[in-house]
Amino acid sequence: MEDKVKLSFDGKDFEFPVLKGSENEKAFDVSELRKKTGLVTLDYGYLNTGSTKSAITFVDGENGILRYRGYAIEDLAEKATFPEVAWLLIYGELPTEAQLMRFRTMLTENALIHENLLHFFREMPPSAHPMGILSSIVNAVGLFTPRFYDDDNKADVFDLTTVGLISKIRTIAAFTYKASIGEPF
């Protein structure tokens, strides 16, 4: 028998399904609440509301728990490299040695940004916040990387786009820092 939560309002009973999360925590699905009852929920600070189902992240702030794909963040920070964690987040498991070597190579091969993006860095106000610069340049990357929009082979495009963007963000962050301290790129 499927678990349900019963809500009584205005003399009527309504049922909502109970779901299990990635850590077997229980929640009830209120996505049909307004449609069924005319009611909405109010959750100050979003403390009791999950925004979506996630197989990637589990957060329990009250108990200090953060996991990515079932791995404690403390373990990943201590034992895994950036490319290993990136692979884990993208593909759902830690990479094999061969996958990791290929991924590292792809990150290196895709680190360069288009030369015309340097104009964006030069035109940013010196007082601009680094996150504002980073997000602006990330948005501009697609203008100079048309292969990110190639629909011929969606799996390859996903891999290239994902690796390309992860790799370029490292370069963009470095350039953003150089710009913030007034040094040339």
Residue ranges and their predicted role:
Residues 2-185:
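Hydrophobic alpha-helical bundle cores within soluble ligand-binding/oligomerization subdomains
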